[in-house]
Amino acid sequence: MSVFEIVFSPTGGTQKVSGLVAGALDKNTVTVDLTDSGLDFSAVSMTEDDVAVISVPAYAGRIPAVVADRLGMVHGNGARAVLVCVYGNRAFEDTLVELEDVAKHAGFRVIAAVAAIAEHSIARQFAAGRPDAQDAAQLAEFAQQIQQKLLAEDASEPSIPGNRPYKQAGGHRMAPEATEDCVSCGACAAACPVCAIDKGDPKRAAGEACISCMRCIAVCPRGARKLDPNKLSAVSQMLSKVCVVRKECELFI
């Protein structure tokens, strides 16, 4: 049995949660990076003896469309899947059920699902520092329960909350822009999951292709990519009404 960690984590929060879950199942995991636009995902194949921890962020209550496309190319071949949805302390809404459907279509058998919290990728003051020690303890406990289910060869499907049809994909696209501090090093263009930034001139970006994942901001060594401050302020004000009360991690098994 091999444990695969299939993860989409543009700013690192989802990776932290995913690592806590997958690492508790097996210290030696095989990583499939869904942010890597150059990877041939159709070449990724598992067996029914394998386990895949599939971890994605919630974007306005849905999985990123690029995740559905890339995960859909993977050959699950009956491997057991643990779904992990990470959100910024607002709500995960239909993310897990959509991920469940995509995973099943790719040939996985879903045996468990986790909803966890990490620092909000846009308004970083919300859920700052998460996953924290309390989250890590909860996720370790979840992983133990999942491990017991695997050892018992229990293939029953969990009851996962969410709606079908899913909520309409929405949210206003917020594309970061280069500031005068940009030196065109190209780090952002190389890291963009959807190739929305011109590699020849990183100050140019295709706003319509941007998925607002904030990876370009996260990887810029000079802090030279920013969101429009007025738009960021408006989003922060909206989120302040729904992100104040601490949400806890949840296990569906």
Question: Where are these predicted regions, by residue range?
Answer:
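Iron-sulfur cluster-binding cysteine motifs and their immediate structural context
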Residues: 178, 183-211, 215-232
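FMN-binding flavodoxin-like domain, especially the glycine-rich phosphate-binding loop
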Residues: 2-36, 42-173, 230-236, 240-253
